[in-house]
UniProtKB/Swiss-Prot annotation:
Its EC number is 3.4.23.-. Belongs to the peptidase A1 family. Disulfide bonds: none annotated. Glycosylated. This is Pregnancy-associated glycoprotein 50F. Keywords: Aspartyl protease, Glycoprotein, Hydrolase, Protease, Secreted.
C-alpha cells in the first residue's frame, strides 16, 4: 500500500 501526506 502507499500513503502520501502533503502539507503547505
Amino acid at each position: 500500500s502507499q500513503i502520501s501526506l502533503r502539507g503547505s
